């Protein structure tokens, strides 16, 4: 009981000034947006095409060693070893490389059995449709949230927090070199749903419930929401560690886990700082 009172007192002190609550995630969102604009996003072979090579190893090498060798010799970082099974290796190139140069880079390490260019799984038109789908998802989500709360300010706060969450996740992809792929797009779509869940949890507890003070209601929502987020982050961290150190060929899973970890961490900031700060300001003005 004593610890709970201490937490409530701490939250009371923090909520006395709601501006820093809004400013911190807002600043991180702007930085993430600048990262995407100026640093850009790498596109995976799924989206831009490339080449696949089937190799036979002449000596034992690890996946990391082979990738490092090819990147150094060919002068490009867009190379991925998809699988190593005994002496058989499959390598993915982000661009259609000159097969002679690839063969020279592999001299003494492996020989090329087959080499073929591959087209993108999704065309630019299909990707544009995905972007439109994300936009419409936000639109319909906005309408649904407005119907639930019947008030534009809490509804806009939920949408703003969800949008900031996605922007920070995409900024993290740019910062850590996680490529935009079918897997990462799927992870972003999952984040939209998760972010809205925690935002609606907070907004419902603070606005709909009448028992307790605003801060006590916020604390109750925070206990549930942060517990959910920590559990999800822990499971994604376990998946990431397993795929990186135990199953390095499962790069798709590690990319999904990395995007979700970044997004879930961002969701803690956008929900429990930004959204809570906006709601605190709104209730203060309304009263």
UniProtKB/Swiss-Prot annotation:
GO terms for cellular component: plasma membrane. It is a multi-pass membrane protein. It is found in: Cell membrane. Belongs to the SecD/SecF family. SecF subfamily. Its main location: membrane. Keywords: Cell membrane, Membrane, Protein transport, Translocation, Transmembrane, Transmembrane helix, Transport. One of its GO terms (biological process) is intracellular protein transmembrane transport. It comes from Methanothermobacter thermautotrophicus (strain ATCC 29096 / DSM 1053 / JCM 10044 / NBRC 100330 / Delta H). Part of the protein translocation apparatus. Forms a complex with SecD. The chain crosses the membrane at residues 21-41, 129-149, 158-178, 182-202, 226-246, 259-279. It comes from the Archaea. This is Protein-export membrane protein SecF. Involved in protein export. The keyword DNA repair does not apply. Signal peptide: none annotated.
